[in-house]
């Protein structure tokens, strides 16, 4: 399940492009998540009232949350699978406070892949997509394992 050095390099290469515009990428990823899976909006009191992509685009709170999400994910990706210290508090908050099911992490992973494909087609070919999918699956599996330890049936 682990990634090779080359795969991690591919992941971090495209992630550098994400970090160049965290707000733009984060906003686009969350809009994609919320429009493709409207049920995910119910987990966000701040965003429940946003019904259209235009309303979502106009929300500064949504933009800020996108930065928060991608900053945390970037920190995890840069650990190249050695992310225990980063995963533990994230799993704790998402299991006990936010009650985010693992399925929703799959949905946001799909949104990340989609947005990276559309924004960076030259840097996100099949190999890079495969590597990113593996990295996101590793992240989800480790979150799911922590959820289980916490007794959360997410």
Curated annotation (Swiss-Prot):
The modification Phosphothreonine is found at residue 68. The keyword Metal-binding applies. GO terms for biological process: removal of superoxide radicals. Its main location: cytoplasm. Transmembrane segments: none annotated. One of its GO terms (molecular function) is metal ion binding. PANTHER family: MYOGLOBIN (PTHR47132:SF1). Monomeric heme protein which primary function is to store oxygen and facilitate its diffusion within muscle tissues. Reversibly binds oxygen through a pentacoordinated heme iron and enables its timely and efficient release as needed during periods of heightened demand. Depending on the oxidative conditions of tissues and cells, and in addition to its ability to bind oxygen, it also has a nitrite reductase activity whereby it regulates the production of bioactive nitric oxide. Belongs to the globin family. Monomeric. This is Myoglobin. It comes from Perodicticus potto edwarsi. The gene is MB.
């Amino acid at each position: 399940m682990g990634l090779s050095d080359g795969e991690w390099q591919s992941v971090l290469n495209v992630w550098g492009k994400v970090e160049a515009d965290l707000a733009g990428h984060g906003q686009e990823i969350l809009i994609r998540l919320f429009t493709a899976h409207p049920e995910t909006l119910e987990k966000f009191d701040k965003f429940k009232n946003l019904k259209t992509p235009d309303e979502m685009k106009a929300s500064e709170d949504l933009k800020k949350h996108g930065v928060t999400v991608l900053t945390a994910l970037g920190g995890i990706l840069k650990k190249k699978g050695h992310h225990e210290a980063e995963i533990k508090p994230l799993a704790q908050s998402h299991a006990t406070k936010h009650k985010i099911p693992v399925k929703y992490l799959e949905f946001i992973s799909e949104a990340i892949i989609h947005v990276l494909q559309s924004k960076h087609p030259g840097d996100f070919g099949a190999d890079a997509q495969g590597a990113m999918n593996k990295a996101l699956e590793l992240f989800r599996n480790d979150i799911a394992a922590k959820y289980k330890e916490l007794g959360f049936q997410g």
